A protein has these predicted regions:
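Conserved non-catalytic scaffold segment of RNase H-like nuclease domains
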Residues: 1-97, 136, 140-144, 150
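Active-site flanking residues adjacent to catalytic metal/cofactor-binding acidic residues
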Residues: 10, 114, 154
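Substrate-recognition/cap helix-loop segment adjacent to the acidic, metal-dependent catalytic center
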Residues: 91-114
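Active-site catalytic microenvironments for nucleophilic, acid-base chemistry
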Residues: 98-102, 122, 141, 162-166
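Short alpha-helix plus adjacent loop in nuclease-associated cores
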Residues: 113-130
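Active-site metal-coordination segments of metallo-dependent hydrolases
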Residues: 128, 147-153
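Acidic, divalent-metal-coordinating active-site segment for phosphoryl/phosphodiester hydrolysis
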Residues: 151-164
Length: 168
């Protein structure tokens, strides 16, 4: 199978404010990882620790600001890509946020977003799956080990592996 462009799978930790981004660039034909990116993002956690990721204010003290991260992603991967994500709603909002913070227009990117979760769920249901719709359970069905604390780059790589198993 050949996609029209390379696929950039993104994942963020943090819902209200992004505190970490992971990104994995996959070859449009082989889906082999060509490049990757990961960084924490400066944010005010109000002295709370993110329970799912273990990220604290101390972790973020030297992290780049959203604007810098948006510029870094733009310069590293450009816009001639398909953006993909696992449950894309929150990830795309955070991606738009860091791109806008960098003074860039999100419309430079193709508006077609590859959301891997629904494709994975449909694939499993079609093959007799009757388990939970939760990510952990679906990842497990595709052979992933339990994640423990969430890490954006690791989550991108798990999503990439699921995508490969669905389409290759």
């Amino acid at each position: 199978m050949k996609f029209t462009k390379d696929i950039l799978i993104i994942d963020f930790e943090g819902l209200a404010e992004p505190v970490q981004i992971g990104a994995v660039l996959l070859d449009q034909e082989t889906l082999i990882e060509k490049d990757y990116f990961s960084t924490y993002i400066l944010a005010d956690l109000k002295d709370k620790i993110k329970i799912t990721s273990g990220i604290s204010q101390e972790t973020l003290k030297d992290a780049p600001a959203q604007a810098e991260v948006g510029q870094m992603i733009f310069e590293k991967f450009g816009t001639d890509i398909i953006i993909g994500s696992w449950v894309a709603n929150a990830d795309i909002k955070n991606f738009e946020k860091i791109i806008a913070a960098a003074g860039l227009d999100f419309k430079l990117y193709n508006y077609h977003i590859l959301d891997i979760w629904p494709a994975a769920y449909i694939y499993l249901v079609k093959h007799g799956y009757s388990g939970s719709m939760q990510s952990e359970e679906i990842f497990k069905e595709f052979g992933a080990k339990p994640r423990g604390l969430h890490n954006a780059l690791e989550d991108c790589r798990i999503a990439a592996d699921v995508l490969r198993k669905i389409v290759l």
